[in-house]
């Protein structure tokens, strides 16, 4: 929703959201989640066996995994904060995600108050990597601002993501970082919104969304680029 004038930017968390399977024509085949609360942001492992998603079923926005048929649901994260936007590594053994993780008393109160209203403020987020079961959790960015929309390079050794850490506002550009948090490199240099990057499985193509060249409108389009390591 559009925030009121002078208010902070927020996202809605709809408690009616569930996860479904659809065929390629858009027909619903099966409902995978039925718990009360927000179940969304689902992505499928490249191995085709598991799904990772964000849920409020425990009272906070945590990551969970389940089998591709919806069975064997397991909680992955357990710390206060908005854990979401998760993707599997190419070999299906790790997860990359972004999280808000409030620490101060005032930040914790604000987070809880907003969540009680079905809202989150996605303006302070960092990237984390962990094993699929949640073990070996590591924070790989500490840049400030909103660092989000992470995606693994097909090598499994690098992460591409969107960030506004240089300005803390606008624009958002794409950055590359090693999975251990070293070697930060800027990829796009637009005065626009560049986000949601994804590699082709062979690593030769990059697709991302951007509102560049939109004639001054609020339109966001998809772009494809060659990727050269």
What role is predicted for each listed range?
Residues 198-199, 206-212:
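CBM-like carbohydrate-recognition segments
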Residues 1-18, 31-39, 54-64, 68, ...:
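A flexible loop/linker signature enriched in serine peptidases of the S9 family
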Residues 81-84, 92:
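Right-handed parallel beta-helix/beta-solenoid
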Residues 72, 93-94:
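Right-handed parallel beta-helix
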Residues 23-27, 67-71, 131-135, 178-182, ...:
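Short loop/turn segments that connect beta-strands within beta-propeller blades
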Residues 46-47, 90-91, 154-155, 201-202:
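Residue-level detector of Asp-centered blade-edge/turn motifs that repeat once per structural unit
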């Amino acid at each position: 929703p559009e925030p009121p004038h002078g208010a902070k930017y927020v996202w809605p968390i709809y408690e009616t959201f569930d996860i479904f399977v659809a065929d390629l024509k858009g027909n619903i085949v099966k409902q995978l989640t039925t718990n009360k609360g927000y179940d969304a942001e689902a992505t499928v492992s490249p191995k085709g066996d598991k799904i990772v998603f964000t849920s409020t079923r425990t009272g906070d926005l945590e990551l969970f995994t389940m089998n591709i048929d919806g069975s064997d649901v397991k909680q992955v994260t357990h710390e206060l904060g908005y854990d979401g936007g998760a993707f599997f590594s190419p070999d299906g053994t790790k997860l990359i995600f972004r999280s808000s993780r409030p620490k101060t008393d005032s930040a914790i109160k604000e987070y809880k108050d907003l969540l009680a209203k079905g809202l989150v403020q996605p303006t302070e987020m960092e990237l984390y990597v962990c094993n699929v079961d949640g073990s070996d959790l590591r924070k790989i960015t500490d840049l400030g601002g909103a660092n989000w929309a992470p995606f693994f390079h097909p090598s499994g050794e690098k992460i591409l993501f969107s960030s506004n850490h240089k300005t803390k506002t606008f624009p958002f550009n794409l950055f590359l970082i090693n999975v251990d948090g070293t070697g930060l490199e800027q990829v796009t240099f637009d005065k626009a919104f560049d986000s949601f990057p994804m590699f082709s499985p062979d690593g030769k193509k990059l697709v991302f969304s951007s509102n560049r060249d939109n004639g001054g409108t609020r339109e966001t389009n998809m772009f494809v680029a060659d990727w050269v390591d």
